[in-house]
């Protein structure tokens, strides 16, 4: 039976972050994901790296400070999939007075270390404003955007780069302590193949299933309860041609973002709704759609209706239950619980957390685990560059560099590769000298060479992995085109698995 230093269960952002950090400190690491990387909460966020301006109202100063400081760290770690964005906050005096917002923004500017992101300012909305004419003033501040699913992917690739192992579609079915070690059982959900490992330590980073794995996988009492809070978003054709996002205040004191996305679209969200069902079955409700449309329409001149929605997505935030009365008041901070058996076989469990603070969460997790691993390496992730991030400049600069090296690339394709794969693009293009060398075009410039790369290097096994998480090609591909991808994948994955087996 193979023995690992650490087995991490859960392939979302926290699991991938902890696994990458541990592997980089010299531990032998295995990460297990029951479905696909980032298949739940971690691909259903607002796609922001932000301090969380509204958390200041709930006195979450530690969380906000840590998140603010992480923005510029993550921009340097993943410049191909993260970039700064300005946010405009229309002022509505009956909701929050200007002095309160100014104080909040002053704290936002100064709570975290900020060297490259510009500070907040007041703004006047003139005749060319996209907002309703009665909204004449507001504020503007800095946060950042990130491709959430690809941030998870980049961390999983880092696990492998540092000598670890990542298995997707491999469900951990049981874990128990035995003779000072963990015995972990798992099963391939496609083939039924059974696995058995020993591990010196175990991490439960299963997100919405963290308590369920305590109950059913380990038969241990969970140290904390969790509350599942659903957040839903709607996607519509681009509502304005400005680069800025908008943060809208609503009568219920909640806020809604309107975020420009991929040139053609705007993301509007999110909601905060208590959720009691299966996290895998989460979906938007009509009441949430109506809520988001109502908040948007109260602010913008361009009005939207149900028929304008081109896509929706929902996720469940597994928040540590602090007995708050309302979903929006529950802390977004994380709690790390660790316990062992006679000083051996530690179990570290993750409750809560935000996309923005995943790296610090992982660092704190390793601080708690370090005493169990004499000789473990030091913290290292703050100055690392994630796979794909070696672009030496901006995403636009790298797209131009790609077109110089591969002059057959269209501007849109070079931009897609730059913003999706960054410096890993050269694994896709190789020695190609024409578009014909990239193989079949499945639609919207989604070529066979890209899909091969996704299978070979990014754990893609299903169509939805490729077109909704590694990329967002699903926004453009027809049902017929998606069916063709499914056929191609079935044949290629089978061939891929046979070659690996041999």
Model-assigned labels for residue ranges:
Residues 2-14:
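Beta1/beta-strand and adjacent pyrophosphate-binding region of the FAD-binding site
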Residues 47-128:
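Dinucleotide-binding Rossmann-like beta1-alpha1 core, especially the glycine-rich loop
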Residues 142, 148-150, 158, 218-241, ...:
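C-terminal catalytic lobe of FAD-dependent flavoproteins
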Residues 2-4, 191-201:
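Core beta-strand elements of the Rossmann-like FAD/NAD(P) dinucleotide-binding domain
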Residues 23-44:
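Glycine-rich FAD pyrophosphate-binding loop
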Residues 168-182:
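A conserved short coil-to-beta-strand element within the FAD-binding core of flavoproteins
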Residues 204-219:
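Flavin (primarily FAD) binding-site architecture
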């Amino acid at each position: 039976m193979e023995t690992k230093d650490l087995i991490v269960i859960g392939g979302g952002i926290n699991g991938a972050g902890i696994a990458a950090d541990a592997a980089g400190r010299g531990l032998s690491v295995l990460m297990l994901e029951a479905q696909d990387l980032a298949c739940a909460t971690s691909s259903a966020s607002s796609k922001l790296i932000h301090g969380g301006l509204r958390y200041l109202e709930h006195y979450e100063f530690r969380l906000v400070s840590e998140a603010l400081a992480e923005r510029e760290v993550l921009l340097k770690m993943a410049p191909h999939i993260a970039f700064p964005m300005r946010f405009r906050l229309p002022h509505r005096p009956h909701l929050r007075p200007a002095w309160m917002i100014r104080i909040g923004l002053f704290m936002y500017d100064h709570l975290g270390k900020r060297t490259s992101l510009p500070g907040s300012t007041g703004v006047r909305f003139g005749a060319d404003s996209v907002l309703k004419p009665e909204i004449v003033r507001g504020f503007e501040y800095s946060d950042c955007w990130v491709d959430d699913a690809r941030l998870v992917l980049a961390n999983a690739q880092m696990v492998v780069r540092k000598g670890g192992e990542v298995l997707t579609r491999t469900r951990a079915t049981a874990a128990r302590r035995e003779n000072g070690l963990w015995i972990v059982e798992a099963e391939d959900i496609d083939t039924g193949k059974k696995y058995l490992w020993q591990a010196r330590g175990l991490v439960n980073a299963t997100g919405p299933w963290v308590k369920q794995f305590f109950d059913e996988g380990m038969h241990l009492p969970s140290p904390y309860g969790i509350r599942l809070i659903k957040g839903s978003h709607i996607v519509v054709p681009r509502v304005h041609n400005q680069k800025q996002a908008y943060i809208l205040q609503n009568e219920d004191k909640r806020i809604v973002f309107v975020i420009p996305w991929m040139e053609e679209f705007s993301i509007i969200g999110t909601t905060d709704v208590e959720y009691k069902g299966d996290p895998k079955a989460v979906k938007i409700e009509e009441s949430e759609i109506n809520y988001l449309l109502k908040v948007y329409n109260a602010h913008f001149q361009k009005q939207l209706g149900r028929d304008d929605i081109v896509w929706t997505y929902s996720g469940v935030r597994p928040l540590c239950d602090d007995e708050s009365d309302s979903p929006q008041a529950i802390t977004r901070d994380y709690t790390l619980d660790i316990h062992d058996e006679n000083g051996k076989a530690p179990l570290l469990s993750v409750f809560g957390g935000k996309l923005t603070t995943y790296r610090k969460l992982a660092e704190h997790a390793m601080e708690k685990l370090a005493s169990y691993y004499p000789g473990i390496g030091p913290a290292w992730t703050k100055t690392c560059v994630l796979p794909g991030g070696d672009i030496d400049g901006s995403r636009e600069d790298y797209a131009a560099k790609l077109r110089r090296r591969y002059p057959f690339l269209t501007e849109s394709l070079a931009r897609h590769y730059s913003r999706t794969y960054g410096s890993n693009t050269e694994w896709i293009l190789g020695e190609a000298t024409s578009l014909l060398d990239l193989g079949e075009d499945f639609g919207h410039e989604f070529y066979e060479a890209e899909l091969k790369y996704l299978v070979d290097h990014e754990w893609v096994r299903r169509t939805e992995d490729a077109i909704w998480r590694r990329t967002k090609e699903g926004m453009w591909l027809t049902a017929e085109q998606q069916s063709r991808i499914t056929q191609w994948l079935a044949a290629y994955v089978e061939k891929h698995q046979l070659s690996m087996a041999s």
